[in-house]
Amino acid sequence: VEDLGHASLLAFRGESWPSLRLRYIRAMEQLHLLHSCPFPEEFPLQPAFDEALYRWEQSYFAEHLLGAHLGLETDSFLNHPALEELAQFLASLPECPVHRDSQSQNVHIHAGKAWLIDFQGMRGGRPEYDLASLVYDGYARLEPEQAKELIREWEKISGQPLDDRIFRACALQRLMQMLGAYANIGHNQGKTWYLAQIPAGLEHLRKLLPGSTLA
């Protein structure tokens, strides 16, 4: 057991981009190592992502962000065929171990290395979901060009081009889950700081939607 201190990746947000970029690369290298591992036999992971879990995340977003936070009617959203199609598409893809919440607060920097923490939600899923968690993190608020640069670095680390359709699908799904969590924690646990993170997440979602067709 090693004390990793309190220096999360988020704590370095004010650094110059060249320095911060290297920290993100270290984090992505750790994520790729995780994704390259076989499923462990020594201890069970959480139930893998499947169509039902993806649909639950969508309902979570609808209930807490659209309904409770924005005061919108949610039935028409939840009944839209594109959501079922999104869940079915993601559930049909091969899986590997994923962190599920690899945002900047869950990456700690210690002794020049990146360490993944709070991995109790680890399960089978798509690596692109973890990548989206990192580059579209509502806390870190990376600039669009910075996110694009990190995506290019991810392709170098993984050794293969990123499938745009899969990445967009994972990013949409992750952003819905993330925004639902911000609204839920902010309103129901009294942690209003989370509500201030919603606009950045919504902006990422808006930018992804125009090209997000799964047809």
Where are these regions (language model features)?
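ATP-binding pocket architecture of kinase catalytic cores
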Residues: 1-56, 60, 67-70, 92
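Hydrophobic packing residues in well-ordered alpha-helices of helical domains and bundles
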Residues: 24-27, 54, 76-83, 172, ...
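Structural preference for long, well-ordered alpha-helical segments in enzyme cores
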Residues: 27-31, 82, 86, 154
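Active-site acidic catalytic loop and adjacent metal/ATP-binding pocket
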Residues: 34, 84-131, 138-142
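All-alpha amphipathic helical-bundle segments outside canonical DNA-binding/catalytic cores
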Residues: 46-51, 162-171
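Active-site activation/catalytic loop segments of kinase-like enzymes and analogous catalytic loops
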Residues: 59-69, 114, 127-160, 172-190, ...
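Short secondary-structure subsegments characteristic of cysteine-rich extracellular domains
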Residues: 79-82, 86, 189-211
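Eukaryote-biased recognition of C-terminal alpha-helical segments
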Residues: 213-215
